[in-house]
Amino acid sequence: MAGLFNILKVTVSEDKICAHVLVNPGMPLMTSEDIEATARVYYLVPAIAKHLCLGDSGREFQDCMGQTELCHLLEHVTVELMNETGLAGSISCGRTRVSEHDERVFEVELSCPDDALAIGALSSATFMMDWAYLHADQPAPDVEGTVAGLRNLVLGMRAEAEGKDPHEAVAAANGEDAAEDEGADEGDVPVDAD
């Protein structure tokens, strides 16, 4: 089944990734072509409306959200997912440009010092937009759960790279006691030894 987007290529550099994204044939190029779907995206991640956006009319993304490229919306959803993890650093931002060779191909540049976080957020944003534009009859994506999953993935990868136990690092970062998780199941009930 075709989705809205096809990620053609991802280039990773030290502080950003650049994804070449095809808006699949037959899919809308502009948010104005399906304003209800665009509104569904907004309801999933309402903070995108207040993102600083210098490329279009106005100062905030809400000023152009109803009439911009779908890949521009994808950029803002991705940046918001990165921001919500709390792991993207002090500034995460993006930039979207149409390809010189094909009006359906866009370069989506995401500034973030963690390539796994940026790629994971891009993949998650793609899934969320597919839901909003193509599968709104299905249950809505769990944004909070997605953010938690991305956060745990990145924390685990960082811990592993430092030679630490990823499970302990994730539990500590989330304020959980790793020892609590071992041994007892939720359904275990103490038994009186009399």
Where are these regions (language model features)?
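Scaffold signal of the M16-like zinc-metallopeptidase fold and its non-catalytic homologs
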Residues: 73-83, 121-132, 153-194
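Short, surface-exposed linear patches
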Residues: 41-45, 129-134
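Generic hydrophobic/packing signal
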Residues: 68-70, 92, 96, 100-105, ...
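M16 family metallopeptidases and their MPP-like homologs
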Residues: 82-129
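Short amphipathic alpha-helical segments that mediate assembly, nucleic-acid/protein binding
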Residues: 70, 143, 147, 166-169
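Acidic/histidine-enriched alpha-helical segments
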Residues: 53, 132-158
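Noncatalytic linker/hinge segments flanking ATPase motor cores
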Residues: 59-67, 114, 146-156
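His/Glu-rich zincin catalytic helix
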Residues: 1-86, 175, 185-194
